[in-house]
Amino acid sequence: DEDIYKLNRGGHDPYKVYAAYHKAVNSKGAPTVILALTTKGYGTGSREADNTTHQVKKLSIENIKSFRDRFDIPVSDSEIEELPYVRPPEDSPEIQYLKKTRKALGGFIPRRRTTSEALKLPDNSIFEKLYESSGDRKISTTMAIVRIITELLKDKELGERIVPIVPDEARTFGMEALFRQVGIYSSAGQKYEPEDADKVMWYKESKDGVMLEEGITEAGAFSAWTALATAYSNYDFPMIPFYLFYSMFGFQRVHDLSWAAGDAQAKGFLIGATSGRTTLNGEGLQHQDGHSHILSSTIPNCLSYDPAYAYEVAVIIKDGIQKMYVEQENYFYYITTINENYKHPEMPKGAEEGIIKGMHKIKTSDKPSVRLIGSGAILNESLKASEILKKYNIESEVWSVTSFNLLRKDGMEVERQNQLNPLNKKKLTYVEECFEESIPTIAATDYMRSYAEQIRPYISGQYITLGTDGYGRSDSRETLRDFFEVDADSITRAAVFALFQEKYLSKDEIEKIYKELKVDSAKPNPWEV
């Protein structure tokens, strides 16, 4: 038994390991796998090959001495209880070999560059085009983001840095023009004739293609995004990846990878391109996203936005490039866009700061009795509700909330500063600065109510949140918004109720309005059916 024990297992025999590695390095034409037989807890004395090794928190002194003796570590018995670090001298063969080898491989790892080459902001005309009204033309915010990506790819300074990535749905997002413009990357080139070869925008693959079309693999597509998003640190060559996906199939499926990307200080854009629980309708409940912004809020350096208009998308993308690639701040952006087409207004003067901070006013009133706030597609329902309220002589103001998550972060920061400096003048949160008047506030989004609930501590008056809690239905947008009670009538109902609570409306008035709105008091909770 003693003689057999002295026979090294392959994974512990330097000669065998070297021989296997040498053969692997010199094998051509196929990858090589080395199977190495080893012993769990190798070198730890009595703990060697012990099934409970994983539960051991620390080794006994005797086991440590066995480890020292086995590997000839120069530590005396008088020192060993202190568990000193042992480092070979600089001129030792071990250190010299390590340094020489790492130099040949390009440097030491792990190594993180915190800064890299600073990029220049692209020509402002790329973004200014979307600051204008769409006129009578109805477009979606997904179309707006694709337009920006297309223009960025043409930019002389940044074009080579831009990489669009999709897991499968390029045509769904209206990105087929990029097939011809930049091509789809394939290491082998085009190996087949695509079904649409006779079309103008055919499925063109090439070795020098730029777009990554990864097939139905969100994990693979996100991994490609992470590799590009960390290129600034790994290769000192910042890239600007745009990964577009169904928003339900983003954090829901690859949240662990998203967290890892945040931990690695990734920089880039994630685009949830068909977002909203009522907006991507008819494809089954598993497609209808009502919580991706809640998931994104768990990642500290993820800045998430839910814009309603093309000009908001443009301002956010411009700010992202400025923060991540010019100022070199460690963030990545999650932006939800929608596939619903509607008319987009011109950007209000001076709206940029509010868009970036998380909220800006889009409809004013001299004497508002109620405040309506919304995001994404549901903002249009808030605007419709404002018009309905006007019929009942109720004035309202409307705000576009681009990010409840950022409003919450601002609130937490201000609260903390006030706690740390109790003798200083109390600072106000951005929400408090915007909402000076204490009037009822009605929030409506295409996400769970907890998304809008985040800013409740910073609102002085009544605050009612409407959202899309529950699984929902596979139906039309109009029906779904009525089902979840985030449509214009439901927002109006909430506003009227709040005003009744404030004694602004009488019993007769609220009964009349409820009747005209066809309020069904027996309707079941949307999140329970």
Give names to the regions the model predicted.
Residues D1-E82, Y85-P345, E352-G354, N405, ...:
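Thiamine diphosphate
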